[in-house]
UniProtKB/Swiss-Prot annotation:
The lineage of its organism: Bacteria, Pseudomonadati, Pseudomonadota, Gammaproteobacteria, Pseudomonadales. Residues 1-19 form the signal peptide. The keyword Cell membrane does not apply. Immunity protein that plays a role in preventing early activation of toxin Tse1. Binds to a large surface of Tse1 and thereby occludes the active site to specifically inhibits enzyme activity by forming a hydrogen bond with the catalytic diad. It comes from the Bacteria. InterPro entries: Tsi1, Tsi1-like_sf. Gene3D superfamilies: 2.40.128.650. It comes from Pseudomonas aeruginosa (strain ATCC 15692 / DSM 22644 / CIP 104116 / JCM 14847 / LMG 12228 / 1C / PRS 101 / PAO1). Forms a heterotetramer with Tse1 consisting of two Tse1 dimers and two Tsi1 dimers. Formation of the complex inactivates Tse1 enzymatic activity. This is Immune protein Tsi1. Disulfide bonds join C22-C167, C79-C121, C147-C155. The keyword Signal applies.
Amino acid sequence: MKLLAGSFAALFLSLSAQAADCTFTQLEIVPQFGSPNMFGGEDEHVRVMFSNEDPNDDNPDAFPEPPVYLADRDSGNDCRIEDGGIWSRGGVFLSQDGRRVLMHEFSGSSAELVSYDSATCKVVHREDISGQRWAVDKDGLRLGQKCSGESVDSCAKIVKRSLAPFCQTAKK
């Protein structure tokens, strides 16, 4: 019985440490050399690629057409995200360990933050942020309402949330 209790305690501590270490860094999405309609960003763990479907826009602020391509360097897996709304170019973040990609997706008046497993493209967590200003930083997720400007700092009401749900195990 002590062995079982010890195993549960170790699992709990491991999950708690994972949640506590859940931080995301914004990924700069830039034009890819040699391919005028491809944009992407990368770090040592993962590469994220978008296709720009508008040949007249060489500096898009969003990518309206799936898929998004993920190349996970740690596992060697590549995958495609086929579902999604419009992906915001400035709304792509990577987890510190490279296992999660967090993206801002929107369509019409609805908006979500969605995290994906970088090796499988499975959804880890999604959060509806419709009608709110948002920011991801070292302190977590900040959501603002009653805003006078475009940034979350212009909001009269700001709620802080943990990023831990975005780092959990991918949903099946």
